[in-house]
Each structure stands twice: as structure tokens, then as C-alpha cells.
Amino acid sequence: MKNDINNQQGSQQQVPPIDNPFLTMLGVQFLENGDGQAHIALDLTEQHMNSWQITHGGVLMTLLDVVMAVAGRSLHPDQKGVVTVEMKTSFLQPGGVPGGRLDAYGKAFFQSSTMCFCEAEIRHGERLIAKAMGTFKYLKQLRAGERMRKICGSD
């Protein structure tokens, strides 16, 4: 999967990075996307660690989820976005320590007009850390947050 992205650089149509305060707080870097593929990275700090001082599994799952969403979204840049319907994650090795860097690679392998099916992996250098598969639904309109504010009476 890693090499697929590098081999496609010339033909990619970039999708704007996701405007997400959580991802900004984590420090996620959006490096490449287009043609159903994506690459993001995270420079690890103490805040990304669990009690054993290795990368927290929730951080790894977030990277996998986001890189698959960006890959799927790159096939339909005219859509508002995608939401995760289902995700399966396999943790293969501990995910890195402060000062390290994780690279996540995503690929959309099948799509319909409303759904996209993706796979992703995270690497720490050459070490394969985790893999995932996910199903995503394309959205055209209202953001879930906007809808929830209306339901909860915040607007």
C-alpha cells in the first residue's frame, strides 16, 4: 500500500485537509491524497502515549480512520465529506514512542454512489504497526454537529 501512493504522485487531485479541531490537537499532518489514496503522519509526543509509554490504541485507530476517510473522500471531492459506518482494526506491534513518527496510508478499493470501502496501514519506519478496513458513507449536506446543535437547542 505504501508504494501505491508514491507511484501515483503525478496524477493526484488533492482534497483539502479535514477541518477538525481534534486532529489539529493531535498534530496530524496531511501529506498526500488523491485517486483513492492518502498518506498522513504523526510525530509522536508524550501526549500520544498510554500508561506503558507506547502509542495509545485510540491514536492508532484515529489515524487509520482518518486516512481511510481522506482516501475515500478523494474519489468524490465534490461531496461534503464521509462518515465511518464500520471499522475493523488489527494491532500487530506496539506503535512507537515519543520522538518517533507514524505514517498512515489509506486506499479506497471499492465504491458505489453512496458508500466507499477502504483499507489502511500504519508504519513506524519499515515496521507494520496496525491494519484496518472500513466502510464509509458519502455525505452531501448537513454536518452532524450542525444537526445535533439543532436537536439539542443550541441554535
Model features per residue range: what roles?
Residues 1-155:
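Terminal targeting signals and extreme-terminal segments of soluble enzymes
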